[in-house]
Amino acid sequence: MYRTHTCGELNIKDVGKKVVLSGWVDRIRDLGGIKFIILRDRYGVTQVVVNPESPAYEISQKIGREWVIQIEGTVSERPESTKTETQTGEIEVIVEKINVLSKAELPPFYPGDKVSEDLRLKYRYLDLRDKNMNKNLIIRHKMAQAAREFLNKHGFLEIETPYLTKSTPEGARDFLVPSRLQKGKFYALPQSPQLFKQLLMVSGFDKYYQFARCFRDEDLRADRQPEFTQIDIEMSFVEMEDVINLMENFVRYVYSSVGIKLPEKFDRITYDEAMEIYGSDKPDRRFGMELKDLTNYFKDTDFKIIKNVINNGGSIKGFITQIPISRKIASELESYVKEFGLGGLLWFKLENGEISSPTNKFLGGSYENISKDYNLKDGDVVLLAAHTNREQLNTALGALRLRIAKEHFKNLEEGFDALWVVDFPFLEWNEEEKRYVARHHPFTMPKNIDSKPEDIKAYAYDMILNGNEIGGGSIRIHNSEIQRKVFEIIGLTNKEAEEKFGFLLEALKYGAPPHGGIAFGFDRMVSIALRTSSIRDVIAFPKTTSGTCQLTGAPSSVDKSQLEELSIKLFDIKEGGDENE
């Protein structure tokens, strides 16, 4: 028997017991010839003591950190002065026998050391020994268990869908898998189980879910991975309200399993409201700074830049904040909004009851009226911008408010703000392809399909938590004629629609129920619960921002024989552009 107890289990009630523990040597101290070893496993730590007269003393002299050992001994109460408030802090084990299970070389770092993320990812098995990383994966497990408990209780079936499927791009690039048996043909790893879960609804499985692995070949950010986990959910015979109400309860239940209480009722705003007020379709409302339309305050101005914008149908918008402002800071913020296509940034502040601004000479009257109408107080700063494209203006100011919040508001770690964003545009214009594309995906039910393309709204909904989209879903199209019309609107010919989605169009002919669903980004849900800066901290073996695995070296080259078997030739992949066939 390797152990009778874990290293986080023993307490004062176990004093006098003979026990066997196994784990990693976390730390070693030598006090007056007595060896104090902190033994660690994923459950906790236990102090074990090797006295000079112990038969195990000689071997204890040779043990190093991160060795894996087994000890046998007797549980003893610690002296009062050495007790701690940890789980095993009242006891220690007096060692009678030590068995070395595995030696450890000097590691590149010890658990808990502050080292670069690249090094952590290269030696991820060492990194995961850290108590914080250990906690992250335990919390992830608890949230996954809670999700399954809730869905099982509400009659959902967990059903797996294929990983090797047909390439039907949904916005990002597919990861392609060559077929050895079907020369020249490829599978695609699924970006989501979207079409299969709809086919399950057609099959009569009215409540489905799975923890789906999804794959998207896209540029990565802190909250993106090329492979990720989503909780995929679909229901038949539901309207949008049914999905929203049940999924609110679902998310509350999952977060409550790790001690987080979410609001009893999630607010709901439209996409248009989100963009107008927060400059984002995933608004973070924890710090105010709502965007205000200030155009009317400048309609009589002679200030050329502002006047030209207004005369060309543009807008002036801004928000109130309480950050320290100076010409240097303002210049940095102006450079930032220029990255989003704005020409510049105006600002003024109220200081000792007076307006202070570099443009006070030209716009002081407008600033005074804004100050009065919005009841500004000393220290308030108003940041403003003007542009003829209102959407671009909203987006730039939305990004600016997020930057300011991140840099200046330290209390964002407190509390959780949850809401739904609804009434999304069904389509968006793709300038590169010169056509409309589906904003979510082309299987979403449109509200007013006969309207102008830019006016069509979707039965789509996103769940937002602390400014992060944790879930997105929609009511689906269950009528083949409507589905064909949507394909036509986004520029697919009948032939292209049949080639890409013929199996779906065929299925919709044979009695498809009204259905809808949602998918939750599970990695992101866990990351928010733990307030980590990156979802990499809640994934056991993540990829880097360049999509590589530091641990295994993936992606890697393969043998020429493997490529020949797949009838694949590679060109221009060596350094210097040398051809490799």
Curated annotation (Swiss-Prot):
Subcellular location as annotated: Cytoplasm
Disulfide-bonded cysteine pairs: these are none
Binding annotation for L-aspartate: 170, 216, 440, 476
- CDD domains, per the entry: AspRS_core, EcAspRS_like_N
Q: Which reaction does it catalyse?
A: tRNA(Asp) + L-aspartate + ATP = L-aspartyl-tRNA(Asp) + AMP + diphosphate
Documented EC number(s): 6.1.1.12
Xref: InterPro entries? Aa-tRNA-synt_II (IPR004364), aa-tRNA-synth_II (IPR006195), aa-tRNA-synth_II/BPL/LPL (IPR045864), Asp-tRNA-ligase_1 (IPR004524), Asp-tRNA-ligase_1_N (IPR047089), Asp/Asn-tRNA-synth_IIb (IPR002312), AspRS_core (IPR047090), GAD-like_sf (IPR004115)
Establish whether keyword Transferase is in the entry: no
For this UniProt record, the keywords arranged alphabetically read as follows: Aminoacyl-tRNA synthetase, ATP-binding, Cytoplasm, Ligase, Nucleotide-binding, Protein biosynthesis
**Where is this protein chiefly located?**
cytoplasm
Domain of life of the source: Bacteria
| Assembly description | Homodimer.
List the NCBIfam families. aspS_bact (TIGR00459), PRK00476.1 (NF001750)
Q: What is this protein called?
A: Aspartate--tRNA ligase
- Lineage of this protein's species? Bacteria, Thermotogati, Thermotogota, Thermotogae, Thermotogales
